[in-house]
């Protein structure tokens, strides 16, 4: 008698797409690799076209099954996000997974200097506004636009918001 318990299928249909914001950063690349490994196609988004091209090449060299495409997108600009969503709709690409990963991330080489400039008493309002525009407003706008499209066709989807460990662990 055959076992009636089916083996779990850990792969995702190749027709599923995940959009990753801040895709050219370390975490963005790791999210892309993990999703490609299980067969999900990836839409990389970031604000640096050269880094997007390089990240796409690097991921394609790993020979995953999923497709990799990219778009220049500024998460702090609703117009930029709408432009990308419209392009995806034109190409018949539905976003099934949204990973809100974009953030302002100082390079490790400037960490010592960054600690001095990120102390509350020296933190500029300009830097504050930028951090909120990318990390908070960007996640809101992407969730609003892509989440709205997920809800519109009643197929649902996944929205994953990535936060820094500094949200729970003080840097010093």
Question: PLM features: residue spans?
Answer:
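Canonical Rossmann dinucleotide-binding motif of NAD(H)/NADP(H)-dependent dehydrogenases/reductases
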Residues: 10-43
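Active-site loop of short-chain dehydrogenase/reductase
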Residues: 16, 65, 94-95, 111, ...
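Rossmann-fold scaffold of SDR-type NAD(P)-dependent oxidoreductases
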Residues: 21, 95-112, 135, 161-164
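Conserved glycine-rich Rossmann-like NAD(P)H-binding loop of the short-chain dehydrogenase/reductase
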Residues: 40-54
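The beta1-alpha1 cofactor-binding region of Rossmann-like NAD(H)/NADP(H)-dependent oxidoreductases
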Residues: 49-50, 72-84, 125
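A glycine-rich helix->loop->beta "capping" turn
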Residues: 64-67, 87-100, 106, 124, ...
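Hydrophobic positions on the long internal alpha-helix
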Residues: 84, 99, 142-146
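Catalytic Tyr-X3-Lys loop
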Residues: 104, 116-141, 160
């Amino acid at each position: 008698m055959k076992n009636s318990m089916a083996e779990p299928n850990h792969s995702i249909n190749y027709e599923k797409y995940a959009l990753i914001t801040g895709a050219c950063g370390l975490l963005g690349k790791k999210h892309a690799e993990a999703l490609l490994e299980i067969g999900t196609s990836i839409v990389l988004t970031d604000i640096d076209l050269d880094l997007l091209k390089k990240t796409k090449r690097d991921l394609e060299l790993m020979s995953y099954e999923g497709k990799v495409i990219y778009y220049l997108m500024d998460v702090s600009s609703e117009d930029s996000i709408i432009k990308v969503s419209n392009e995806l709709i034109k190409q018949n690409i539905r976003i099934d997974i949204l990973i809100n990963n974009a953030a302002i991330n100082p390079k490790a080489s400037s960490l010592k200097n960054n600690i001095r400039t990120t102390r509350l008493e020296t933190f500029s309002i300009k830097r504050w506004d930028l951090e909120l525009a990318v990390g908070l407003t960007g996640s809101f706008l992407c969730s609003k636009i892509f989440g709205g499209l997920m809800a519109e066709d009643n197929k649902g989807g996944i929205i994953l918001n990535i936060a820094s460990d500094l949200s729970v662990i003080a840097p010093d």
